[in-house]
Amino acid sequence: MEDRQTRLFLALILSMGIWMGVNYFFFPNTSTKKNTETKQTQSDKTSENTKQQITSGKTKESNSADPVVQKEKITPFDTKKSFIVTDSYIVEFSSLGGKISKFYMKDFTGPNGELIQVARKNPETVVVDGKSYQAVELSRDKGFDFNFSDSLVEISDSPWNYIQFSLTEDKINHSISFSAVSPDRSYQLKKEFRFYPSENYFKLSISIINFSKEKLSFASQKNVRYLRTFGSLGPYPKDRPLSDRDTANFFRFYYLGGSFQDTLDGSSSVGFWSSVGNFFTGNSGTDESFSIKTDKESGVDFAGTGSRYFIAVADPLDHKPHGIVLDNRPKNESGAVLVYDNILLNPGENYNLDFASYIGIRESEGMAFKNPELDPSQSKNSPFVGLSSDLNKSFNQGITTPFRNGIIWILKQIYRFTIPNYGWSIIIFAILFKLVFYPLNQKQADSMKKMQELSPQLKTINEKFANDPKMRQQKTMELYKKNNVNPVGGCLPMVIQIPIFIALYTAFSDTIDLWNSPFLWVKDLSEPDVIWTSPAIPYFTQTGIGLNLLALLMVGTQVFQTRMTSVSMDPNQKMLMYVMPVMMLYIFWNMPSGVTLYWTFQNVLSIGQQWITNHLKKTEEKKKAKV
């Protein structure tokens, strides 16, 4: 799976691997879903028809062109608005474009009766029928239009967005219906949004009705149609421009040809190693403004967009779109755009497209159905029959998902039954982790102590063979073997912590429960703990440089622990001892402070355990000396 966090994980593992490898091979006396090509997939390949559209910006002639509308003639007072409020949603509809103009999410009750708080940070007050709600907007003030285009350059702003649709409300069934006739009167476009009060799903039905007396080629290989579903998702900071760190949290995804893929907004789905190849070959990897991924055999199973804590996904229930469009233009907000090339209607025929749409948190609790009659896995009469069984991959975090989910569950239980603060929950979790792996940690501490005891002999070897590295290493290994010391014996606890570290990172990066959680001076454990920001530095940064106290404390404890367990070292080893903390500081500087807090407290516990081990060892040696 092309995971957006692949680069971070590989960088982390590679860094630690280099550190341990250098220690083992060069300084032995220092303590220390597969990605597959889809069948018949046109990866980053655009058809000749598409290329003409991109270069010319004009739509290709077809039996039914998209409506041509003069935008300046639209009068706002002709637009009608309507609202639907469910247990978790507040949805505003507009007749202009027949679309969702604003989509809000509020706190709701999970499938097990627990309160899931969504309106945690900078919520908006939304008033509907005189009642106020606290909610977060997920539609970026731009809405979700679910409209067709026949030109790639118009997918973000379909001509249908400037047509006034008729609007019909059905308060009893919680549905809104729109209808509009094409300017040439050849067909009618209908859309029905049906909501279910207790669920985080809604059903969308799009109908195309041929009004003409001839066959209507609505979509064909010569006249491809693009359906924009969900645009880029919110929430996003409205008081400042998006930074690079912000944009890294927004992505789009799709399931095509049996393979799940995701990519950042405004970039192509180029994998990590492809990116490395592009770097050395000088290829940007995004030569085209648009790329189309297709699979004629199985088509698109689902597609959607996501932000740090939320996802929006459209799952075709009764059909499979031909492919998906990836808009590679910088800072685009096109989102998930489906490709259709085979919609042919006889005179008077009604062609229907049904979608199950989910908008909610990136957790299984959000996707779970509360009403078993609506759950397609339990009821054959569910309106969502045909829902993809792979939909949960929309928020899958790869091989660390079980660790992540386990950590979140443990943190929630600690939060619930002890101190209701996730900072203290992390500290208690760190203590529990230390206790569970006490035998391994103690073995590490004993190994460090033995290494220190060999320090004089190691110093002699280093001085004697200063100009012969090969012999120095050989004699060092002989000394370790003679004294039954494993130079990498202390690395196992660190290796075990790698998946824990990655799982903690993903947990604090995208789990709604930990969003905006304070601890002592830390305002938000899901963000770096910036205590001070410098003024803007000309030609370097427009926003200044933040000072992250917790990251500095982490490095301080790391240096102290290293010096506490260090043995006799040559100059190269000393340099490594000081380079590693700088490397760790770089990795942790922009990490969620919850992860840094965990690592810092692990260092503190390790320092305490090592001190106790050293103290007990000295006491034991004194007793032996007296005897």
UniProtKB/Swiss-Prot annotation:
Residues 33-57 have a biased composition (Polar residues). Residues 58-68 have a biased composition (Basic and acidic residues). It is a multi-pass membrane protein. It comes from the Bacteria. One of its GO terms (biological process) is protein insertion into membrane. InterPro entries: Membr_insert_YidC (IPR019998), YidC/ALB3/OXA1/COX18 (IPR001708), YidC/Oxa/ALB_C (IPR028055), YidC_ALB_C (IPR047196), YidC_periplasmic_sf (IPR038221). This is Membrane protein insertase YidC. The gene is yidC.
